[in-house]
A protein has these predicted regions:
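Structural beta-strand segments of beta-rich domains
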Residues: 94-102
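Extended acidic/polar, glycine-enriched regions
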Residues: 31-35, 101-188
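Short, compositionally biased P/S/T/A/G/V-rich stretches that sit at domain boundaries
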Residues: 70-91, 446-458
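N-terminal carbohydrate-binding accessory modules
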Residues: 82-83, 153, 165-233, 253
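Substrate-binding/catalytic cleft of secreted carbohydrate-active enzymes
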Residues: 227-233, 239-458
């Protein structure tokens, strides 16, 4: 996918890719006091130099402008980016430090150094009054740290969110204001599993595509949030993998609100392209991390192309970029082969070993190349036993039992952090895949989100 943006017939910028947001400064090209025509030209063809394309992929990407587009009005000097993270003392004490990495931009004509005041306030979401936690005089980008007493932690059962208000002031005037939703929590994968706020949690999740019948990707905020509601409240999982690309901010925001953990990853499926392609994939890592790193639900960055082979130089770079932009989260990389080169923090593996009669999963030691590192199963079942919602009952029961068997086996393996079943619902695909009708019947629900018997397992 490629987008070219024109203002009054003049190209002012563009973007490659279809899964993360982008912005273009058009202020210097505007006709002040006159009508302006803003045009976006979208090329939705499968460009071989842009991930996930380059070879066949097992899902449809559709096309068009399927998420929001808007004009953002700003002062010449504004808050360009705010990255929030926290330090929480061990023992889950109620006091924490809020760390803010703030980027200030000046789109004006002067390079004159100016001094600004950054002021931060916080309130628990749903309450009325903000409390100021600190302020600091700055002349440029700044990393600030302010104490926040008596915080409530974000967790699965009580996902407390705070609104952090950051104000940029000069001579007592507010130039810009940003309100960011944030959750205080610790999340870490260790050798023996995943820990949230110091407590071990076995991840029990499903993979989700963002497609719908008839409309492809083009569903509004309400439907994105509804999928998160289905995962948490109807299916009963505690985690979701956004296969195989970053998904709508509305979906992830709802995961924040529900206490649903998210493993998100860059676009791709098995294929690694040339140097131009790889450069775009690295840009995809940058965009993904910068746009989703304030979400407490996000616990793992997927920095490998799903089920691709080893490419150490390439994946050293994707891993480096993710850690540089967000040192607070670990990285993973989904592979379909054992004893792979492990450059990330977590060995994530698609385990399709279960055939309905054998043990539900492989031992960690049989798969990972470093048994001292965390291990996570990123896919299972799916194409091993395609099942329609109207298949005969015995077939649907066996489909459900395959999910039971894997979940039971993973629960018995103390050193496996958890697993993500393939997948939440059936989806459209290319002609090379599916059941001859361009549909993959791999879900525990059909594509209309009606449950099959396997949905009850979760």
């Amino acid at each position: 996918w490629e987008a070219d943006v024109y203002l009054n017939g003049i190209r002012v910028g563009g973007y490659k890719g279809g899964y993360t947001a982008f912005s273009i400064d058009i202020s210097k090209k505007l006709r002040i006091g006159a009508e302006n025509v803003l045009t976006v030209r979208v090329d939705s063809r499968e460009n071989l130099n842009i991930p996930p394309f380059g070879y066949v992929i097992d899902y449809m990407t559709y096309g068009g402008i399927y998420r929001e587009a808007y004009v953002d009005l700003k002062n010449e000097t504004y808050l360009a980016d705010i990255f929030l993270h926290s330090e929480i003392p061990e023992g889950q004490k109620p006091d924490a430090k809020l760390i803010s990495e703030i980027e200030i931009k000046n789109s004006g004509k002067t390079d004159e150094k100016k001094e600004f005041l950054i002021r931060q306030s916080i309130r628990e979401r749903g309450t009325e009054n903000y409390r100021q936690i600190g302020e600091s005089r700055v002349a440029s980008d700044r990393k600030l740290s302010f104490p926040v007493p008596d915080v409530k932690l974000w967790d699965l059962e009580n996902p407390v969110l705070y609104e952090v208000k950051t104000e940029l002031l000069q001579n007592g005037n507010v130039l810009d204001e940003n309100i960011t939703l944030f959750g205080f929590r610790t999340a870490v994968f260790l050798q023996d599993g995943f820990y949230l706020n110091g407590k071990k949690v076995k991840l029990r999740g499903l993979n989700r595509h963002q497609s719908y019948p008839y409309v492809g990707y083009a569903m509004p905020e309400s439907m994105q949030k509804r999928d998160a509601d289905i995962l948490k409240n109807e299916l009963g999982v505690n985690a979701v993998r956004t296969s195989h690309y970053p998904q709508s901010r509305h979906f992830v925001e709802r995961c924040d609100e529900l206490g649903l953990l998210v493993f998100t990853e860059i676009p791709g499926w098995q294929h690694i392209g040339d140097e131009i392609w790889k450069k775009q994939a690295v840009e995809n890592v940058k965009d993904m991390v910068e746009q989703y790193r304030n979400h407490p639900s996000v616990i793992l960055w997927g920095v490998r192309i799903n089920e691709s082979g080893d490419d150490d130089a390439f994946y050293q770079e994707t891993n480096r970029v993710a850690h540089e932009l967000d040192p607070t989260r670990q990285t993973g990389g989904v592979r379909a082969h054992k004893k792979s080169s492990l450059l990330e923090d977590v060995y994530t593996y698609n385990d399709f070993s279960h055939n309905g009669t054998n043990h539900g999963c492989e031992k960690k030691s049989a798969v990972t190349s470093d048994n001292s590192k965390p291990y996570l199963i990123s896919e299972y079942n799916g194409h091993m036993y395609p099942t329609k919602s109207y298949d005969w009952e015995e077939h649907r029961v066996w489909h459900a039992m395959r999910h039971v068997n894997v979940l039971d086996a993973v629960a018995g393996e103390a050193d496996i952090a958890g697993s993500f079943g393939w997948c939440m619902f059936d989806y459209n695909t290319h002609k090379d895949f599916g059941s001859g009708d361009r549909i993959c019947y791999h879900g525990v629900m059909d594509m209309f989100r009606n449950p099959k018997l396997a949905a009850a397992v979760y």
